[in-house]
């Protein structure tokens, strides 16, 4: 998949978790926390068929790099990695991978949660949800019907 710690991964390619762990590991690593986002089968009472992720690639990569660098400055961690998938993803498929290494688990957990929250808030990746009731753009907690 490449050796970058920040990446947009185009379907059909998926995450290589062992590679991700190796990229953030060092002799000072005491623990690693992994967040792996998945496409679930239900949202707000609607049956989800798939999610379609689109991105402004260059800007998304730059913002993910900023978030990673901010996490390295803000938390006492060893390293961090952010990979986000793009394309049509079926129920059960992986969507985002955040891996954080630290000397101690608490810092790794806190940094990982912060990174996931910041990616959702700041990175120009758009999520379209295809359900049994139609298609919706997901904007935070808002669901906006797709107009055709």
Swiss-Prot record:
Q: Where does substrate bind?
A: 38-40, 104-105, 120, 127-129
- The protein's Enzyme Commission number: 2.8.1.12
Q: Identify the domain of life.
A: Archaea
Pathway-wise, it operates in: Cofactor biosynthesis; molybdopterin biosynthesis
- Which Pfam family name is an example for this entry? MoaE
Mind listing the UniProt keywords for this protein, alphabetically?
Answer: Molybdenum cofactor biosynthesis, Transferase
Catalytic reaction equation(s): 2 [molybdopterin-synthase sulfur-carrier protein]-C-terminal-Gly-aminoethanethioate + cyclic pyranopterin phosphate + H2O = molybdopterin + 2 [molybdopterin-synthase sulfur-carrier protein]-C-terminal Gly-Gly + 2 H(+)
GO function term, MF aspect, one: molybdopterin synthase activity
* GO biological process terms, semicolon-separated: Mo-molybdopterin cofactor biosynthetic process
InterPro entries the UniProt entry points to: MoaE_sf (IPR036563), Mopterin_biosynth_MoaE (IPR003448)
At the top of the EC hierarchy, this enzyme's class is: transferase
Q: Which family does it belong to?
A: Belongs to the MoaE family.
Functional summary from the UniProt entry: Converts molybdopterin precursor Z into molybdopterin. This requires the incorporation of two sulfur atoms into precursor Z to generate a dithiolene group. The sulfur is provided by MoaD.
Q: Which PANTHER family match?
A: MOLYBDOPTERIN SYNTHASE RELATED
Q: How does it assemble?
A: Heterotetramer of 2 MoaD subunits and 2 MoaE subunits. Also stable as homodimer. The enzyme changes between these two forms during catalysis.
What is this protein's name?
Answer: Molybdopterin synthase catalytic subunit
Give the source species: Pyrococcus abyssi (strain GE5 / Orsay)
